Amino acid sequence: MIMITGASGTVGRAVLDEVRKSGKPFRAMYRSSNDGRKAPPGVSTVQADFADKNSLRQAFEGVGAAYLVCSPIPQLVELESNGIDVCLEVGVRHVVLNSALGAADYSKSFPSWHRKVEDKLKASKLSCTIVRPNSFMQNLVAYNAPSIRAQNAFYAAMGNAKLSLIDVRDLAAVIAKALISPAEHAGKTYELNGPEAFTYAQIADKISRAVGRPVRFVDIPEEAQRKTMLDMGMPEWQVTALLDLQQYYSILGKGGEVTQVLPDLLGRSPITLDQFLAEFKDSFRSQAAGA
């Protein structure tokens, strides 16, 4: 039995879809009954919370391989550590941990939290696979599409730094392989980058071509970006963590590497940014055009 935690999240939903295609038995974990009701028909669901070990013990009973992912919140280390503890208690044989690019060498922001969980997992002696993905193509829709629709522009303190964005569906395909065939991926840590690296200005050009109108990237000072995010109601810890992560990309230049790791694992070419934008171009449609 395979356990998919975070099944209502962007990555978890994609992992569910991939594992479902395989025909392997699996269970999808949701934190609330409302989320569980959104599961695809026929999917075996269970309600549990990483903050409640008793609920986790019941949810993980009989599970052989588990995908662990938690929302990027300050309690991440504690919550995912609970998941590792329960996996040990109930006899889970293999864990696939969703970490982040930068966990190996960045002492700030989300990557540093993930590294603490990685270290605990490795020390536990559980068989495991760790995935460290770069930023997602889907984040362009989640974070940049609103200003693109309203102003034909998006803003960040990124300068000319390059990012090799990865499609969540490619990440999910790798995770599913590790869940379905754990022996082939045990003890491995995969840093997963997209197939091409682009600056935000180049990404704006690609969005422009996809939607058929000019879209600009506007490089702004970090403090201006901080103020904008705070004005939007984002909590200060989240703003600081996001800007620290952005510095990993923009100042340290750590987000633009392109490697063969992802295509080798997939056994095919990864989804390109052009392909992604062609599929999701309606998400960037101008409000003036009636979006």
Segments from the language model and where they lie:
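A hydrophobic C-terminal alpha-helical subdomain
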Residues: A14, E18, E223-A291
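Conserved SAM-binding strand-loop segment of SAM-dependent methyltransferases
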Residues: S44-Q47
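Oxidoreductase cofactor-interface core, primarily capturing Rossmann-like NAD(P)-dependent enzymes
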Residues: M1-R37, P41, A51-V63, P72-S81, ...
